[in-house]
């Protein structure tokens, strides 16, 4: 049988309709034979608020004269990467993104609460001066009011995404979930490899998901502007675009080594109206202090955070916003995992292994959020792998303790895996992963054994990036390539054992502004730096002493 697709009448569309489908059967992709066959679909369903579905593209191409065999080849190659996310709404289905975001911290506190009958956060953020739990009022001097509420919220499972943010998301969401057929064929592995691609927006990464949310709450509060840090530049780019969209002032402190390595990234930020300063700088008190103590330093995310916070707290009408680490950012990034899980559930795909790069932890936390919720509730079991650079091994070689979130020791203290706030990592090319700590949420999950971590060297990372780019046609960011490296490793294990595991990883962004790094790799000028035990002990020596009983 054949499927008929037609556009809903204009009047119906204006009333909220979208693509109507008379779907009575047909053929869908058969993985065994690698032939495409449509499966039976819901009959006479009206798809509201729809993006153009893969099936409509197929119909339009067929109408344009494409041969059926060619169309089947296109569907075989693309059906698993169909960017349409399905969710139940009434009788039909909606193609779009989730209307609410999920709190990963909710499931952790609920799990811990079941064990000791107390759902309160056992490891709250601490005031850097008093070492006592921070209040909402104290956090409000640094962050926007609504973001403070989100940061301290351990009770809500979901929050509604404001309409203004949803409208912005329509520019680039939902993002594609892609079956890496060509990579599988190249590796000759029985494993199935999928990646969630977040690079299809102007920032080139997942960072825009949280940037627009934080900028929206700042604008809604009536603020003049925001300050922030950025490593490789994706977060700064995302925030500068979001602020431009909402007419907010944007002040960015960019880690010095990335500022010098990625001049075009900073020009993108300036194009969107942001001011960009290399960090550490002589424009702030904390920057001057760091320069005096570490002459010639190339900076770190911790340094840039300190400078951004100093400026935000010293200017009326400004607040600090951040690109990773804290609960509020992981919350905004949960849209990645919610879209992914909805799409995989729709096509009866269950990942065995879920992999993500980890610097501060927001993209990984967002990707695993709905899957981890199932694991914590005992409903399913997944293998989660966080991948970090060997030059900044927060999880694999760090300690689980309270530490400052920034180098200048002006930010709240968080219970996390850390190398010490004074640790300055080597100037590797994954600027977005050069952070001394890790998300408190992910740290808790790792500490409790729900997630594993691996550290990889950057030459091996770029070898994997090149291999991926040559067969999949996307030039990955250095940060994303850490996940690619481990995904390939796991696929090769399947080749050895014959296991047909399903591997999912987060492709967080593109690397088109990282060509200096690729050039050094191709010219054999890239080196691997692994901190010695002495280097790490020096960082641990600066950890604050926090009373066990708060």
PLM segments and residue spans:
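Active-site nucleophile and cofactor-binding loops and adjacent substrate-binding regions
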Residues: 197-210, 226-236, 326-329, 355-360, ...
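Active-site-proximal loop->helix
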Residues: 227, 235-298, 394-406, 515-523
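Residue-level detector of structural "landmarks"
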Residues: 20-22, 27-32
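Cysteine-centered motifs
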Residues: 82-84
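A short, small-residue-rich loop immediately preceding and capping a beta-strand
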Residues: 210, 218-257, 350-364, 384-385, ...
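Active-site/ligand-binding loops adjacent to catalytic centers
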Residues: 157-160, 290-328, 336, 348, ...
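Short glycine/serine/threonine-rich phosphate/pyrophosphate-binding segments
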Residues: 204, 208-212, 228-246, 260-263, ...
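Positively charged, low-complexity intrinsically disordered leader regions
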Residues: 110-223
């Amino acid at each position: 049988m054949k499927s008929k697709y037609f556009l809903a009448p204009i009047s119906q569309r204006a009333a909220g309709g979208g693509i109507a489908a008379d779907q009575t059967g047909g053929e869908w992709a058969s993985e065994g034979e690698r032939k495409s066959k449509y499966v039976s679909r819901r009959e006479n369903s009206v798809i509201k608020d729809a993006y153009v579905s893969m099936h409509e593209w197929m119909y339009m191409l067929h109408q344009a004269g494409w041969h059926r065999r060619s169309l089947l080849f296109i569907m075989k190659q693309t059906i698993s990467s169909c960017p349409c996310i399905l969710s139940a709404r009434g009788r039909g289905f909606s193609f779009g993104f989730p209307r609410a975001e999920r709190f990963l911290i909710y499931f952790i506190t609920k799990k811990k609460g079941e064990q000791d009958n107390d759902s309160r956060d056992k490891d709250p953020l601490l005031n850097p001066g008093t070492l006592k739990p921070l209040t909402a009022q104290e956090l409000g001097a640094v962050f926007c009011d609504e973001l403070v509420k989100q940061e301290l919220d351990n009770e809500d499972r979901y929050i509604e995404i404001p309409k203004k943010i949803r409208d912005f998301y329509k520019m680039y969401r939902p993002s594609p979930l892609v079956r890496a057929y060509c990579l599988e064929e190249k590796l000759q592995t029985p494993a199935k490899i999928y990646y969630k691609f977040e690079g299809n927006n102007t920032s080139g990464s997942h960072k825009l998901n949280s940037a627009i949310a934080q900028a929206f709450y700042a604008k809604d509060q009536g603020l003049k502007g925001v300050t922030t840090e950025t490593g490789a530049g994706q977060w700064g780019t995302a925030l500068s675009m979001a602020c431009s969209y909402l007419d907010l002032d944007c002040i960015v402190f960019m880690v010095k080594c990335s500022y010098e390595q990625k001049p075009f990234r900073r020009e993108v930020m300036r194009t969107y109206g942001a001011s960009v300063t290399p960090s550490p700088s002589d424009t702030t008190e904390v920057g001057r202090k760091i320069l005096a103590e570490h002459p010639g330093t190339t900076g770190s995310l911790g340094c840039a955070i300190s400078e951004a916070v100093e400026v935000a707290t010293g200017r009326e009408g400004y607040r600090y916003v951040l690109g990773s680490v804290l609960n509020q950012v992981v919350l905004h990034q949960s849209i990645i995992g919610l879209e992914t899980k909805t799409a995989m559930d729709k096509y009866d795909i269950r990942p065995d292994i879920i992999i993500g790069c980890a610097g501060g932890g927001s993209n990984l936390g967002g990707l695993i959020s709905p899957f981890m919720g199932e694991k914590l509730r005992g409903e399913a079991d997944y293998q989660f792998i966080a991948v970090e650079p060997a030059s900044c091994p927060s999880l694999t070689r760090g300690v689980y303790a309270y530490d400052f979130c920034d180098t200048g020791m002006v930010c709240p203290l968080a219970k996390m895996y850390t190398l010490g706030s004074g640790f300055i990592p080597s100037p590797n090319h994954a600027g977005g992963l050069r952070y001394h700590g890790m998300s408190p949420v992910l740290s808790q999950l790792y500490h409790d054994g729900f997630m594993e971590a691996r550290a990889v060297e950057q030459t091996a990372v770029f070898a994997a990036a090149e291999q991926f780019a040559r067969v999949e046609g996307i030039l990955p960011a250095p940060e994303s390539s850490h996940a690619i490296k481990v995904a390939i490793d796991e696929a090769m294990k399947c080749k050895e054992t014959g296991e047909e595991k399903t591997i999912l990883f987060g492709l967080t962004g593109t690397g088109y502004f990282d060509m200096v790094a690729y050039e050094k790799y191709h010219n054999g000028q890239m080196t691997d730096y692994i901190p010695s035990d002495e280097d790490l002990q020096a960082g641990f020596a600066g950890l604050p002493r926090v009373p066990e009983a708060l």
